[in-house]
Amino acid sequence: MENKRKLTTVLVSGNFNVLHPGHLRLLRFAKESGDYLIVAVESDRIAEGAAHVPEDLRIEGIKSNSWVNETILLEEPVGDLIKRLQPDVVIKGKEHQDKFN
């Protein structure tokens, strides 16, 4: 009998302006929380001035990480992306701990 286990999909989103050790800890934790890690990098338009590094360079930084299976450019509200992708797990950074999820 063939064992067909469903992969647990994890989603992380953010602007990832200047990739730093905190981002790396977040990505490692996210990968440990599932099998397939999708990282949504906020577009320059969505980041609204929070990102000083252009989106293509921020995406390149995330794609270079071996924990990340897929990188996408986030050009819609993150709630809409979650509804569309329906990941099993959504990981938010510490800066979101006091916000409604």
Language-model-derived ranges and their functions:
Residues M1-N101:
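Nucleotidyltransferase catalytic core that binds NTPs
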